[in-house]
UniProtKB/Swiss-Prot annotation:
Protein name: Parvalbumin beta 1
Family statement drawn from the similarity comment of this UniProt entry: Belongs to the parvalbumin family.
Binding residues annotated for Ca(2+) 1, in chain numbering: 51, 53, 55, 57, 59, 62
Role description: In muscle, parvalbumin is thought to be involved in relaxation after contraction. It binds two calcium ions.
Keyword Calcium listed: yes
Single GO molecular function: calcium ion binding
Pfam families: EF-hand_7 (PF13499)
Membrane-spanning ranges: none
Top-level division of the source organism's lineage: Eukaryota
Length: 108
């Protein structure tokens, strides 16, 4: 669903780097894909694609399946990875990432 937002070689490198359990690092992942240099509107579009239920937020289950949006064969994030990902971006502490929070997280 999100593979079209980045170069195939960059995606392969990013997915390979987080193949092992508990190896996902959102900063490294987004940097490898070049998301940090994209316009905020483009980043929000990516988050809207990740927002499977169109709630305007990325909830825990959507974050857990984050990598599968880039490659269906990718593993789900572990509970620890999901929790760290959420904690890093959840500025208002509501237990979800809003699209604005996601955009800020990607740009870190």
């Amino acid at each position: 669903a999100c593979a079209h937002l980045c170069k195939e070689a960059d995606l392969k490198t990013a997915l390979e780097a987080c193949k092992a359990a508990d190896s996902f690092n959102f900063k490294t992942f987004f940097h490898t894909l070049g998301f940090a240099s994209k316009x905020x509107d483009d980043v929000k579009k990516x988050x809207x694609v990740l927002d499977q239920d169109a709630s305007g937020f990325l909830e825990v289950e959507e974050l857990k399946l984050f990598l599968q949006n880039f490659c269906p064969k990718x593993x789900x994030l572990t509970d620890a990875e999901t929790k760290a990902f959420l904690k890093a971006g959840d500025a208002d502490g509501d237990g979800m990432l809003g699209l604005d929070e996601f955009a800020v997280l990607v740009k870190q």
